[in-house]
Amino acid sequence: MTFNQPASNFFNRMLFIVTALMAGCNSSNNNQNSTAANNQSSKEPAKAISTNAPVASSPKATETLRIAAFSNLRMVLPILVSDFNHNYPNIKIQITFAPNTALYNTVNANPQSFDIYLSGNQTYPKQMLASVKGVKSSPFTYTRGQLVLYSHKYPMDISPTTTLDQLMLDNKPFSLAIANPENLAYGVAAEAWLVNQNLYNNIKPKIIYTNTLDETFALTDSGKADFGFVSLSQVLNKPNNIALQNVNTLSNNYLILPKNSYPPILQDGIILNHPNTSQIFVDYLKSVKAQDVLTDAGFLPICTSTTILPACK
């Protein structure tokens, strides 16, 4: 079974996305507080332009949607917004990015300040539906995360199970960073994978639990943790690595876990305010067009009976 795709394939596709970002996003997507999305230039890659996205009538007057989004969308969401604005130039979008729990706490305390909430799990939107009055929709799933075993120290050319097994057999000291499974679907998936591979009991003393997925990646990327279970989107979109400097070596530093070897990492959202305009963007986000871009950015598409994406076959 193949556990990793060639890095060149991923990065060729990611170069399309980076080109779109540089061409179409005038405001920085690294600002955690907010980013305004503007019309994308004609240099946007053909892959991000499709005829399969729904096109509703754009509001005649300019409207602003305020989106609260999980931090692992920081690279790809501005690209999607820029493409969305090709059809809906009168809908301006402001994005607030934050780690999963911090984002939930912010939105839950100030639901009137946001129109769409895009969480990193399914739990928080359900809680929002129960606790916030006047919510405008039921939770919806907008993407599915991919789990990888990542290391800045160790090259990995075999399966993730064999990699960790061999370290245990050789009695080598190592540490493994995992996001807190109490509030992060990525942590739940990582623990479940270890259990399924009969590794959890032996590796448990070596686990370092982190409060956020960003912290898990930072700890592993800095080498303070030898290994970490992170999202593929984080590895492909390393901070300060827009030039994709490690194209030739990065593929040896991560292994993609088979998607059927751990519980699905489903990321849900919910509409809080401005339901009509918000629904236009949500429909776009769930379209084949947007799901294709999300797939290139390291996510798995949400497949339906009519989805024609290769990843859905």
Residue ranges, per PLM feature:
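Periplasmic-binding protein-like
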Residues: 114-119
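Generic detector of short alpha-helix boundary/capping microenvironments
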Residues: 12-13, 137, 175, 257
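Bacterial N-terminal signal peptides that target proteins for export
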Residues: 2-14
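A short, gly/pro- and small-residue-rich
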Residues: 131-139
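Residue-level signal for mature regions of secreted extracellular proteins and peptides
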Residues: 18-19
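C-terminal motif of bacterial Sec signal peptides marking the signal peptidase cleavage site
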Residues: 22-24
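Exported/periplasmic ABC-transporter solute-binding proteins
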Residues: 26-85, 92, 96, 101-108, ...
